[in-house]
Structure formats: structure tokens, C-alpha cells
Amino acid sequence: MARKKIREYDSKRLLREHLKRLAAIDLHILSAQVTESTDFTELVNQEPWLSSMKLVVKPDMLFGKRGKSGLVALNLDLAQVRQFVKERLGVEVEMGGCKAPITTFIVEPFVPHDQEYYLSIVSERLGSTISFSECGGIEIEENWDKVKTVFLPTEKAMTPDACAPLIATLPLEVRTKIGDFIRGVYSVFQDLDFSFLEMNPFTMVNGEPYPLDMRGELDDTAAFKNFKKWGNIQFPLPFGRVLSPSESFIHELDEKTSSSLKFTVLNPKGRIWTMVAGGGASVIYADTVGDLGYASELGNYAEYSGAPNEEEVLQYARVVLDCATADPDGRKRALLIGGGIANFTDVAATFSGIIRALREKESKLKAARMNIYVRRGGPNYQTGLAKMRTLGAELGVPIEVYGPEATMTGICKQAIDCIMAEA
């Protein structure tokens, strides 16, 4: 599962669109999205309610505590909303130690209310945890002892009996409505492959539940079966995270292939770089370098899997090598070309793309004093490893090559010893 945050606007859109289909509940919520490219005249034509109702406006940027941070404006008319957005659009703010400009807002009707409820659903290994409280709102953390929680195993349905412990202390006049709402939201959660959903708060409007603030995360590995249900969904980067040109290139490459190609720069001046096959193996290599005390020297996180073809691997390896060899400073560097024992991936085929990239970057590798450590197993691995050994002699670049007879992470210690030998 890959949990990806989505904007509040999309969380509410998905809930509104699918709650009726799955639970016969009409959710009368309205919302509009505002960005730098928004034409307010056109927006009002699409959403006429904006000009006739009192409004709420707030950033929709994947960070919380907006109310406590003074970033939520209430009971405004449209002109005031436009002014609020104008004063803050593109302005850098700091949240949770991360700084970034505000680029996206959500605008909604202002809903006066007295009671605030809390609801969250979290997907876990064996089921889902559903939490509910009658004391929702910005002080939910201070009132966490009042939150009721049930765990629902994956194979169990959210029946009225399963929901009953959450709503047992509610007044009778709202208990049934809120119980039906919780079960309906859970149906949407399951059907659309949410991994996390939170409403803090939701309230009651004319006797019907109404989400005021909402967060959602989707399992993006389920996109293949949900693309019609999700519609034009976006998975924004976490607040404060901006892709470098190299990362953007790999991200676009990843979007165009059925394979997985991931690349994140952690420390451009790091001296240990990775190009690892397999999602699990890539994490193990990074963790091992960190556990050995050299996380500060780790230049990147990189992973390729799903049997990418030679051309895709070539383009991928070019980017990794360009970053790994940038700005040589006379000190040794190390590149880990690692992986476990593949089940289906032709090791020789993927290594062919890497070898082509290594040949292209020969002068950069030498200038950066790069030492390369290879460990891999799987179909046709002997041929792939033999090609790597031959390449080392051909280029005059130090390449140490190991097969499945060696431990998977042994090359991490060798890489560290290499870069620290001169210290």
C-alpha cells in the first residue's frame, strides 16, 4: 500500500459523489478550489452559490492546524474571499518546520453550528480502526480521552451492531443519523480504497451530517481499478517538498511506464549513492547505511522494479549517475548497485541499461573518484555480473561484483569503509 494524501477539495468531492451510490445518503456540501490560475468570474458562473452565501476560505495544502495558525477566514463575502486569497497566494508560510508558498485554497459556505463531532478511519494490516468523538474541533488532541474506537477486521461488515459502541452515548435524536453516516462513510472508504480519512469536525445541518473539515489519503496502488471513481484526482507533493529537475524527470518517467522508477535526493553532497532493484531492498540498503551511522552521507533514495526495459533503465541510471558524480571535491564516493534475488526480472537485461549509462559517464565517474559495489541475484544474473566485471576493467573504474552468495547488505559496509579510508 502506498498512502498518498489528497486535497480536502478532492476528499469532499469523492465523499459527496459516492455516498449516495453506496449508502443512499445525499451529502449537500459545496466547495470550490482556487489557485493562481483561477478566474473568479468564471468560477462564479460555475458555482453561483459563491456570490449569494457567506463563505469560509482556507489553504488546501496537505497540512493541518490551519485554524490554530490563523489561516482560516470565516463569514466572508466573495469580495473578502478574493482579498484574503490575493494577500496570501504565493506567500511562504512555515508549518511543522517546513516552509513553502501557499498555492491552493478551498472555499465553502460558512456553516454556523454549535456541536462538533470527530470521525476518523485508518486502514491497518488486518482491518480498519474507526474513531468517533462528540468533542471534535481544534481541541480534539486535548480531548483525546473522549474518543471512542472500534477495530473492524477486514472480513467483517460495518453493521449497526459494529457501529453501536461509537454512538452509544449520543442523544437519541441524532444517534441513528450519525450511525448511518459513519457506516456510509466506511462504505466509501472501502470501495474507493482510502487508507485514511478524517473529519474534524463534522456537524449537523438541518438534521443531516455535514463535514466541515476533512482529510483523506488514498492507496495509489489501487488506481488501476479506481481511475473512473476517483476522476481527475491529484496527488500533491507533501507541503514543503519541491522536486528538483532530476527528480521531476524520473517522476515523469515513472508515470509513463508500468514499472516502478523512484528517485529522491536526500543530500546532494553525500558520498554514498544507491541504485537498488526492488522496493523492499531499496529501503533495506538505505536503512543499513543509516544503522551503521552514516545516514548523513547517504545521497539519495532510489528504487527500480517491475522489470523495466533497457531503455528505461538507461534513462534512469543516467540521472542517478549525474547526481552522484556532481561537483567532485577530490574525496572518494561510492555507488551501491544492489538488490535481492529477483524472481522474474532479467538481471542481465536491466544491467545492460546500467552498463550503457556507466560507459557514457566514464569521465564523470573518474572525476568523482567513484567506487562501485554490485550485489544481485536472479534470472540470468551470472551474465549480468560478468558484464559488470568486464566493464570495471574496461573503464578503469573500481567495480566490486557479488552474487547471491554474498549477504545483500554487505556492500554497504564496504562502501562506508571506502569513503572513510581517507578520513
Swiss-Prot record:
Record InterPro entries: Citrate-bd, Citrate_synth_N, Succinyl-CoA_synth-like
Enzyme class: transferase
One Gene Ontology term, aspect cellular component: cytosol
Pfam families from the UniProt entry: Citrate_bind, Citrate_synth_N
Keyword vocabulary terms for this entry: Acyltransferase, ATP-binding, Cytoplasm, Lipid biosynthesis, Lipid metabolism, Nucleotide-binding, Transferase
Residues at which citrate binds: N343, T345, R376
Transmembrane feature ranges: none
Coiled coil: none
Localization terms from the record: Cytoplasm, Cytosol
Molecular functions (GO terms): ATP binding; ATP citrate synthase activity
Documented EC number(s): 2.3.3.8
Catalytic activity: oxaloacetate + acetyl-CoA + ADP + phosphate = citrate + ATP + CoA
GO biological process, one term: lipid metabolic process
Subunit and partners: Heterooctamer of 4 alpha and 4 beta chains.
Function field: ATP citrate-lyase is the primary enzyme responsible for the synthesis of cytosolic acetyl-CoA, used for the elongation of fatty acids and biosynthesis of isoprenoids, flavonoids and malonated derivatives. May supply substrate to the cytosolic acetyl-CoA carboxylase, which generates the malonyl-CoA used for the synthesis of a multitude of compounds, including very long chain fatty acids and flavonoids. In contrast to all known animal ACL enzymes having a homomeric structure, plant ACLs are composed of alpha and beta chains.
Family membership noted in the UniProt record: Belongs to the succinate/malate CoA ligase beta subunit family.
The name this protein goes by in its record: ATP-citrate synthase alpha chain protein 3
Species lineage: Eukaryota, Viridiplantae, Streptophyta, Embryophyta, Tracheophyta
